[in-house]
Amino acid sequence: MSDLTKTIKLRIHVTPEQEVLFRQMTEQYRQACNFVSQYIFDNQFDLTYQSLNKKLYSSLRGLFGLKSQLAQSSIKTTIARYKTVKQQLFQNPYRYKDENGNWQRITKTLEWLWKPVFFSRPQADLVRNRDYSFVDSGQVLSINTLGKRTKC
């Protein structure tokens, strides 16, 4: 059975207190993704989820105050971004003319990167029934933030 992923975007109306909670959560998530990205860059571009989770999970929880699912999602988000960059580099090889005038190509790998992938916008990848859920017959959205669960 294949996995099916659906992405939704919604606009929710929140109180000023909830807005602060969401901004804190998305900013901490962004910083956690940058932390994971720096680790991947410094450690030979290891993109295996299990090894990254083993090495970074407790640091993500402690340094950024992320709940368990958000810590794991930050690792998955960063791995996905590096895999996208890897594919883009592969599709655009380095081309040059050799001494005979023939075009040669060298496949680019992640080692061609000069700096780690950087996450500039606050974001959060939420997992249904873990980070968020619909309650009250689907009329209310309950979202996990850094400190507490809030309903909108």
PLM feature spans:
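Nucleic-acid substrate recognition interfaces
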Residues: 1-152
